[in-house]
Amino acid sequence: KDRRNDFVLQTKCSLNWRNEGGNFHYERDGYTVNNDTRASAVKKDVEDSLRRMGTDYLDSVIVHYVCGSFPVEETVGALENLVREGKIRTYGLSNSQPADLSAYQEAGGKVSVVQEFFSILSPFHGREYFDLCKKYNTVFQTYGVLEEGFLTSPAFMEREFAKTDIRSRIPWTDPEKKEGLRKAFEIWKPLCEEYHCSFATLVEAWALSQYDRMSLLVGMRKASSVEDTVKCLDIRLRAEDIKCM
């Protein structure tokens, strides 16, 4: 309360749990989750978010899943109307392809951010965007930079996860890939000592070095994690260290 200007609020539209409209995406907890990027759905998603959060504007709204079933022009028109109405300030794309960024821009859009998976272990999809993001002055916001925790420490890599835990199904649980990660941690350890940082902070700093308008989307549950993460903002990796990593 009374601190709205101290925060940047970002949420998403297009995937809805209303059991109606759009294309079937998945089912969970008795709900049918549909992907709908039509103007009426985008408007409802945003207005529902405003009501639930108790605010009169959102700083950033991300189209959660770009959908080719509905006209890009309709989606862009809805988002631009919401900007004019003052309900959102900016908007972006997620789960997309570089061609989608071009399509939104060519339809008269002003895409401020692209949110995609990107890490030192999985950099390829993200790198496809960088030239276009520079062209359109777009922020690249990465999630997954710590690979579900597997890049935080060698000890984390040895943990066992229940079959219902998403971390049990990612590639880095494979024994052969674990061995590769162990070698990476050995290479990175002297760099952590030199830069006085954790493994997590080092790979976050690496991500920031890849594009000059990079934003990190990092999950945190402890104050200590927040304190550790913000250190990456002050680290300037040398070119030879980036190459080494």
Model-derived segments and spans:
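Beta/alpha (TIM)-barrel catalytic core signal, keyed to glycine-rich beta->alpha loops juxtaposed to Asp/Glu
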Residues: 66-244
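Active-site groove signature of glycoside hydrolases
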Residues: 50-71
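Active-site acidic short loop of glycosyltransferases
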Residues: 4-5, 55-56, 88
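Surface-exposed, active-site-proximal loop segments in enzymatic domains
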Residues: 18-35
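Short, acidic/polar
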Residues: 35-53, 97-103
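A short acidic, glycine/proline-enriched capping/turn motif at secondary-structure boundaries
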Residues: 14-18, 68
